[in-house]
Amino acid sequence: TAISEMGYENPTPVQEAVIPVLLHNPSFPNTLIPTANDSEDTSEEASVMSEEASAISAEGADITEAAEESNEVIAEITADADSATEVSAESQRHRDIIALAQTGTGKTAAYGLPVLQNINPKDRTTQVVILSPTRELCLQIADDLKDYSRYIDGLHVVAVYGGTSIEGQIRQLKKGCQIIVATPGRLIDLMHRKVAQLHSVRNIVLDEADEMLNMGFTDSIDEILAALPEERQTLLFSATMGPEIERIAKSYLKDYQEIVVGS
């Protein structure tokens, strides 16, 4: 598939389902996907992100595709979206996404690669927030995103979580970063200290949302979502669709599309 040509020799079902949908999503104003009107245009950002896309493999292998081929790869992703997923062209226009997928299905790449394409690396304000239930997952996501974006000059990812000194995290945030990966409690603390500034956030990802709710982060999640700009995209990943997930979807997601991966 075209996703395989991005460097994923064995893309997982959640990657095949989510990546094409996000790349088609019109709420990504800066998505670097060729269209009938601009297919001949290339931008510096497209070149950088295309090189990055070809560098990633499911096994963490080195670059397997030449950078000059990657614009063609992105175009093929666009063309192959219908065959790569069961999502219709109409449903691809939905703004927000709920993806029901188990842990260990490659979710970070599924949302990480498309989200990275929407970031302006010249702007040091926070543009993406990713919430995770544990310190370990928070660090894993941050490490993966740093790996994916290693060819994007000026892009900074900061992980913030409890159980360690907050001072170092405050210093990192004050330097500016485009992506914050956080546990809900620590992010709330940094918001109250007016260190985490979320007024420019365009994408919010809730990874393992059901686990965060089970751990008692309901109020924190509500406060974080309520503090974000109205114009944003929300991506919610969960293993189950329980009552609290449905409540969050009804309260904070707009015209969302539900993707179910696996049984």
Name these PLM-found stretches:
Residues 1-41, 80-98:
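Conserved pre-motif I regulatory segment
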Residues 3, 15, 99, 115, ...:
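Residue-level signature of catalytic and energy-coupling elements of molecular machines
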Residues 19-28, 108-123, 143-149:
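Walker A/P-loop NTP-binding motif
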Residues 48, 52-59, 65, 72, ...:
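Acidic, glycine-centered low-complexity repeats within long intrinsically disordered regions
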Residues 90-103, 116-141, 152-156, 229-231:
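Conserved SF1/SF2 helicase motif Ia
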Residues 103-105, 115, 191, 212-215, ...:
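Methionine-biased hydrophobic packing positions in alpha-helices, especially
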Residues 124-192, 200-203, 246-250, 258-261:
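Conserved nucleic-acid-binding Ia/Ib motif block in the N-terminal RecA-like helicase ATPase lobe
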Residues 197-206, 210-262:
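Post-DEXD/H (motif II) to motif III coupling segment of the RecA-like Helicase ATP-binding lobe
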